[in-house]
Amino acid sequence: MYDFEFEEIAMSTWAMLRQTWIAVNKTAEVKLAKVGLTPEKAAVLWACRDYSGTLTPAEIARLVFRENQTIAGLLNRMENEGLVTRVPKRKGHPFTEVKITPKGEKLAGP
């Protein structure tokens, strides 16, 4: 991808890592698109499937390295697609819980 060299080893290392990430992400995008997912949606589904304990939007954001606002929008879309459900705040519980649906489980794979 880059056809030039950096003088500093740190920049060369960064460039190689960045190229690797881009290649891996593109491959993931293509494969996940075949089942109607994006890498971001897949990461949320895997977090919902594999996390032990109560999973909140804030915890999902932390697990998938995204901002809370980004996750809120993503969860809205995923809930509309039937991939996750959000259980509203209940008395004595200060947060919304996110759960994977059977459809989400199927797409998340084994």
Where are the model-predicted features located?
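N-terminal leader segment of winged-helix/HTH proteins
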Residues: 1-35
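A structural signal for alpha-helical segments
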Residues: 4-8, 12, 95, 99, ...
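Short acidic/polar alpha-helix capping motifs at helix-coil junctions
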Residues: 7-10, 41, 50, 83-86
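N-terminal positioning helix adjacent to the helix-turn-helix/winged-helix DNA-binding module
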Residues: 9, 13, 40-41, 56, ...
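N-terminal helix-turn-helix DNA-binding core of bacterial DNA-binding proteins
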Residues: 22, 26-70, 91
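Canonical helix-turn-helix DNA-binding module
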Residues: 52-105
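Terminal interaction helix/tail motif
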Residues: 109-110
